Structure formats: structure tokens, C-alpha cells
Design a protein with these regions (language model features):
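Short, acidic, small-residue-rich periplasmic hinge/interaction motif at the N-terminus
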Residues: 27-67, 104
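Extracytoplasmic beta-strand/coil segments of soluble accessory domains associated
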Residues: 58, 75-115
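N-terminal periplasmic accessory domains that precede
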Residues: 39, 74-77, 95-98, 110, ...
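Gram-negative outer-membrane beta-barrel transporters
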Residues: 424-427, 519-530, 549-632, 706-708
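Flexible loop and strand-edge segments within Gram-negative outer membrane beta-barrel domains
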Residues: 221-255, 259-322, 326, 334-362
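Short acidic/polar hinge/loop motifs at secondary-structure boundaries
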Residues: 115-143
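C-terminal beta-signal and adjacent terminal beta-strands/loops
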Residues: 222, 227, 611, 625-630, ...
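Membrane-embedded beta-barrel scaffold of Gram-negative outer-membrane proteins
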Residues: 325-341, 456, 464, 497-555
């Protein structure tokens, strides 16, 4: 272990030394003063502004990058980003984001700057496969605690998905068909194999002030059998093999938008509807007599179908009252996850009987966020006063968990008010302190603070220092779980208090021109996250009494270096990171070691376009190194390990007909990764752990035909 740490330190020192040399050299060269359209961001800003002037370090994945990846949903795109691991659940079909080792409960997911409704609340633990890319303009990522700006759950970071709201053309149309294999399986038949995607986006400028847009997306995943034998199989009573390792899922999404803009006032109304069907096929099929007088037998299986309906309404307005700027969001969101069981006659392919459909997760949200700024009408100093309110009705039935009652119903009203001031001390140096008070009828008042600085070290170089705090409220399971029988005693805890943490980050980026038209941009990052009172399910009485308690301390340390080299039609990006995690766990009389366990990641992307025929080649690579952490097993802590793995995608695109038509083809997951060995999961209080961690369904090939007008 000491040799690994020494090697990692040498790598980081080498990167730092090389970067400093580049920086010294850059001071003697042109600082990219050529005029260009600057990329803008909104996450954490008073108003939309240039990414180089943002006081936060914001990573942007733009529309062209998303298109080049041939991704099918937000999870596919984010999986290419270092230190963001998409965690799939093959049982539920959900995929959530993990940043610096912290799961979906600590990552705030936003669409157009407002949190998205999910199973257990607003913005956290969001299934990213439910976010399509048919009308996405860009994705903004901020790592670190953003509790002042975005409140509960924004401890590891914020992912803000920005949709399209304008067009340069009177009429714009984009339609695409994409067909993919699922590993070696592809079949267009009903209940066939593969993935089938269709989407359409139409935008229309009614006049200089009004714009409207409608988009449609259909994503049908036919499932991946793996070591199982599909829904038609029956008869294995000793070792059931029916079903899928990755269950089938079918999604429909439609979005519509109307936007008005004139002078200093703009507003838009947006509506989004998602329907998802997810099928679970029971591995066990039991013999049933046909009662035909001939001793005939068939096989029945009790299968389950899950259906999700999600509605998102959003109204956004930006205007001025005199010189005071106002930006307000008002949203009503609803998600209802339902299921029904049915008995399926497997050999005859018929449904014998169905049970009524029932809701098992239901969330109903009224949300508003408003911000006032530019009170002093000064370029030197500005401050922002804002509010955020969230009224959530939540419901979870027994299928979602075991609770004190037959179901858990919860109403939460949370109100937050926040204040920050941005002081441009000089043309080169800015500072922004901030504070937030969050009031909840269920928990004690929460206070969060932030302090951000930006120093423009040269014409195209910025050094940012960011400190922030955030909190996380307990979930349904942590508060209300109640699973007690002869063999188990697992209980939630209504007395849990919110988790609290902070992050401290230093970010440096530099850009300059080299000889012969080459341009180089690179950045260095160091980020530390510290979480107190982390909620864990711990043993409180031997041999099998467990309870959720505020017990653990979690620390994460990240060092990263990234570089991008561009010339004409060629670009190369290289990324590296080293992430260390330390967890202080307490379980009865046992305490875990607190040393950091490190994980190395690296990535690269190469893009090249032929000048004359405009054929584009894109290669994406990501390496996730072995990960280690302490796990409790047999009343002692041991090191658990998850093997490393390589991911690579290669895509070729060829435009036709004056760039209106484009044909793309490629291969994803070239190294055919499905699962990796893992000894970090010892199970929970009533289930056994698995020695394999499911990641993907293996190599796939795709073809996409896109029309743009």
C-alpha cells in the first residue's frame, strides 16, 4: 500500500511540475486575446455569464460533445466524466450519480436551475436514465458543497441540465433514429433484443420576441439476459434461470416550451411528461396442471410491471424593477411510481390473471425560488437576496420498504433564505461570501455558509478558492423503516438529525497559444469534502438488532489535472485524478481505521474531422482504478477491494446533403465490461453481499441517422 501511495504522489508531483513549467512559459506568449464567442454558465451565478468570469469552477459538456458521444440519456454522458461514477441498479432500473465516493443522496440534480422530483424528494437520488437528451443544450457540473445556493443535498456537488430555449432559425427541425445492439443481441421484433431510440425536436420563432419548442423521445431497452435465459424460459426448479440480468425498460418523454424575450424581460413556461415501463420477470416458474384429462402441465410465473408517470411544470421569469434584477422560478412536479403483479403462462405466452395497480412511491411538489440582485447598480459590488421554498407530499408503500405502518406518508415544508455579496475588489480579484438559513417543520434550523474567490492571474488564467457547507435531511428509509421478526430487528430512527458537511477547493486554469496554431488549455484542482454525523445502519444489540444512527465521519480528498490541445479540426483532451476516501465508522465496540484509501482515474478524448468531406472521428476513454475501503465483517473491519476497469467508445460520423443529414456508427464499451470483482459489499442486515459489481451490459454497436434543418 505504501508503494502505491508513493507512486501516486510521484504522478501528482510530476503533473504539478509540468503544469508550472507550462504556466511560466505561457506568461511570455499570447494569452488568447482573439475575439471568440465565450461559453456562458448559470449554475451558482447571479446572472448568466462567461465561464471564465464565473466565481465557481464550472465544468461544461456542450451540445456538440453530447452529440459526438451518441449518448442516449444523461447517465451515458456523465459516465465519461472523471470522479462521477454512474451507479446502476439492475433490479429497479435506476442509475444515480456518485461524486467523490458520495452517492445520489449527496448530489443535487437540476433541470434549468431547479431540482428534479424523485422517489424520495426533490433533487436527490435522481435516476439519470429518466433524463433524455432530445432538447439538451449543455450540462453544467460544480463539484463541492453548494448549500447556500441550492440547499438540502448539495454536499458533493450540483449537476445542472440546461435545455434549449432559442434558435437562430425561423424553423429548426432535428429528427434522429438510433439502433443499438445489447452486447451481441439485436432484434426489431416485439420483445426482441437491443435498444431502439427515436427523437424529434422542433423549434419555431413566431417573431423577434416569441419562441416555441416541442420535443419527443422514445427509448426502448429490450433487456440483457446475461447468464439468464429470457422471459420465455421455464422449468428449472432447482436453479431458476428465467428472466434478465438487466430488465427491459421502455420510456416515452415529451417536452414543450414557450418563451418570450424583449428588452430586459424574459419568461418561459415549460411542461415535461415522462412515462416509463419497467418489467421484472420472475426467475421461478412453477408447474400447473392443465386439467385436460391427459395429465398435461404448463408453467406459471408471477411477474411484475412497474410504471412511472412524471410531470414537471416550470415557469421562469427574469426582469428588472428599476435597476434591481429579479429571477424567479415556480414549479409544480409530480411523480407516481406504480406496479401490478400478474400470473403469466410461460409456454403459452398468455396472461392468466392480473392484480390491481398500486402506487408504491408518490411525490407531489410545489417549489419556488426567487433571487433579487443589482440593488446598488454598481459594477464594483453587488449582492443577492433570495428565497427557496419546497412543499413536498411523499408516500411510500410496503413494496418500497418496511415501515412502522403499512405505508409512510410525509409532508415536508422547507423554507430557505440566502444572502451573498460579490465584491470586485479590482479587475483581477473578486470575492463572494454567502449565508443561508433553512427552516423545516420536521428538523432543527440549518445554517450554511460559503466564501468564494477568483483571482485573474493573467489574461487567460484564473485561480479560484471555494469554501462551502451543506446539509442533508434523513430519508424515508432512515426515519421510518421497521422490519422486525424472529430473525431480524431493523428500525429507522425518527430522532435522526440532518447530516452536515463542508468542502474546500482550489482550482487553477490556464490557456495560451503555441506555435503553428496550436492552443493549449489546462487546469489543476484540489478539493476536500468533510461530512459529519453521516447516517448509517449500525448494530446496536447483538446478534441482529440494527438501527439508523448519526455515527460516521466521511472525508474525501481529490487532486485532478486536465489538459486540452486543439488545432484546426483536431482536439485532444487528457484527464487524471487521484481521490482518497477516509471513513470513521463505529459499530458496537468496533471502530474502523481512518487512513485514506486512494483511487486513480484517467481519461482521454480524441476528435478529428476530415477537411474536405467532413467525416468526424471521436474516441472516448476512461480508466477507473482499483478502489479500496474498510468494511465491517464478523465484528471486525477489513479492506474490501473493487477491481479497476477500462471503458472506450469510438464513433464515426458522416454528414450529407449540405450537412442536413448525418449518418453515425460506432462501438461502445469496446473492452466489453459487464461486471467487476468486488469484496466491498458484505450485504446488509438481512441480505447477503455479492462478490460481483454490475456496471454495464457489455460491448454494443450502434447506427444513428439524423436529419437537421
Amino acid at each position: 500500500m505504501s508503494e502505491i501511495c508513493t507512486l501516486m504522489k510521484k504522478k501528482v508531483l510530476s503533473i504539478l511540475s509540468l503544469s508550472i513549467a507550462f504556466w511560466i512559459n505561457a506568461q511570455e506568449k499570447d494569452s488568447l486575446n482573439q475575439k471568440k464567442i465565450e461559453e456562458v454558465v448559470i449554475t451558482g451565478q447571479y446572472i448568466q455569464k462567461s465561464i471564465n468570469k464565473s466565481i465557481y469552477k464550472v465544468e461544461v459538456i456542450d451540445e456538440q460533445q453530447i452529440k459526438n458521444m451518441a449518448a442516449t440519456n444523461a447517465a451515458d454522458v456523465l459516465n465519461q466524466t472523471l470522479n462521477i461514477q454512474i451507479t446502476p441498479d439492475t433490479n429497479s432500473g435506476n442509475s444515480t450519480a456518485n461524486i467523490m465516493g458520495l452517492g445520489g443522496d449527496y448530489v443535487k440534480i437540476l433541470i434549468d436551475n431547479i431540482p428534479v422530483v424523485g422517489d424520495t424528494g426533490l433533487g436527490s437520488n435522481i435516476d439519470l436514465t429518466k433524463i433524455s437528451l432530445s432538447n439538451i443544450e449543455r450540462i453544467e457540473i460544480v463539484k463541492g458543497s453548494m448549500g447556500v445556493e441550492y440547499g438540502n443535498g448539495a454536499l458533493a456537488g450540483v449537476i445542472n441540465i440546461i435545455t434549449k430555449k432559442n434558435s437562430n432559425k425561423k424553423l429548426s427541425i432535428r429528427a434522429a433514429l438510433q439502433e443499438e445492439t445489447v452486447r451481441d443481441g439485436y432484434d426489431l421484433k416485439k420483445r426482441g433484443k437491443g435498444r431502439h431510440i427515436q427523437n424529434l425536436n422542433v423549434g419555431y420563432n413566431l417573431n423577434d420576441h416569441w419562441f416555441t419548442n416541442i420535443s419527443f423521445n422514445h427509448n426502448q431497452f429490450m433487456g440483457y439476459e446475461g447468464n439468464k435465459k429470457g422471459y420465455k424460459h421455464f422449468g428449472d426448479e432447482k436453479k431458476p434461470m428465467r428472466g434478465y440480468e438487466w430488465n427491459p425498460k421502455d420510456q416515452y418523454e415529451i417536452n414543450a416550451l414557450v418563451r418570450y424575450a424583449k428588452n430586459k424581460t424574459s419568461f418561459f413556461y415549460k411542461i415535461s411528461y415522462l412515462n416509463e415501463k419497467f418489467n421484472f420477470y420472475n426467475p421461478v416458474s412453477t408447474p400447473e396442471s392443465l386439467n385436460d384429462g391427459n395429465g398435461g402441465t404448463t408453467y406459471w410465473a408471477t411477474d411484475r410491471e412497474y410504471n412511472t408517470d412524471r410531470w414537471i411544470h416550470q415557469f421562469n421569469i427574469q426582469t428588472n424593477f428599476g435597476h434591481i434584477r429579479y429571477m424567479g422560478d415556480f414549479s409544480y412536479q409530480k411523480q407516481d411510481r406504480k406496479y401490478f403483479d400478474y400470473i403469466y403462462d410461460v409456454p403459452n405466452r398468455t396472461i392468466v390473471s392480473e392484480k390491481p395497480e398500486n402506487s408504491y412511491y408518490k411525490t407531489d411538489v410545489i417549489y419556488s425560488r426567487g433571487m433579487f440582485s443589482n440593488f446598488l447598480n454598481s459594477k464594483k459590488f453587488d449582492f443577492q437576496l433570495g428565497y427557496e421554498l419546497d412543499h413536498t407530499n411523499g408516500y411510500a408503500s410496503l413494496i418500497a420498504g418496511n415501515f412502522f405502518e403499512d405505508s409512510a406518508r410525509r409532508k415536508i415544508f422547507t423554507y430557505g433564505t440566502f444572502l451573498s455579496g460579490e465584491w470586485n475588489i479590482s479587475d483581477r480579484f473578486s470575492v463572494r461570501p454567502g449565508a443561508r438559513l433553512s427552516v423545516s417543520e420536521n428538523f432543527d434550523n440549518q445554517f450554511n455558509y460559503s466564501l468564494s474567490t477568483r483571482w485573474k492571474t493573467s489574461g487567460n488564467s484564473n485561480l479560484r478558492g471555494v469554501f462551502g457547507t451543506a446539509n442533508r435531511y434523513p430519508t424515508y428509509d432512515e426515519l421510518y423503516t421497521y422490519f422486525v421478526n424472529l430473525n431480524h430487528d431493523i428500525q429507522g430512527n425518527a430522532d435522526l438529525k440532518p447530516e452536515n458537511g463542508y468542502s474546500l477547493g482550489l482550482f487553477w486554469d490556464q490557456g495560451f497559444s503555441l506555435r503553428d496554431g496550436w492552443k493549449l488549455n489546462y487546469n489543476l484542482e484540489a478539493l476536500y469534502v468533510d461530512l459529519k454525523d453521516k447516517i448509517e445502519l449500525v448494530m446496536v444489540k447483538k446478534p441482529s438488532t440494527y438501527k439508523y444512527l448519526n455515527m460516521d465521519t466521511y472525508r474525501s480528498l481529490l487532486f485532478a489535472a486536465n489538459a486540452n490541445l486543439v488545432k484546426d479540426q483536431f482536439s485532444l483532451g487528457v484527464r487524471t485524478s487521484l481521490n482518497g476516501i477516509s471513513v470513521s465508522r463505529y459499530d458496537m465496540d468496533v471502530t474502523s481505521p481512518t487512513d485514506f484509501q486512494y483511487n486513480f482515474q484517467a481519461g482521454a478524448n480524441v476528435s478529428y474531422k476530415l477537411k474536405n468531406i467532413h467525416t468526424a472521428f471521436n474516441l472516448y476513454y476512461k480508466y477507473t482504478g482499483p478502489a479500496r475501503l474498510y468494511v465491517l465483517e464478523n465484528e471486525a473491519f477489513r479492506i474490501g477491494k473493487t477491481d479497476g476497469f477500462h471503458m472506450m467508445d469510438f464513433i464515426v460520423s458522416q454528414p450529407f446533403w449540405k450537412d442536413r443529414l448525418e449518418l453515425s456508427a460506432g462501438v461502445k464499451n469496446i473492452f466489453d465490461v459487464t461486471s467487476v470483482n468486488s469484496t466491498t459489499n458484505v450485504g446488509n442486515a438481512h441480505t447477503a453481499g455479492s462478490d460481483r459489481l454490475n456496471l454495464y451490459y457489455g460491448r454494443s454497436y450502434f447506427v444513428r441517422l439524423m436529419y437537421q434543418f
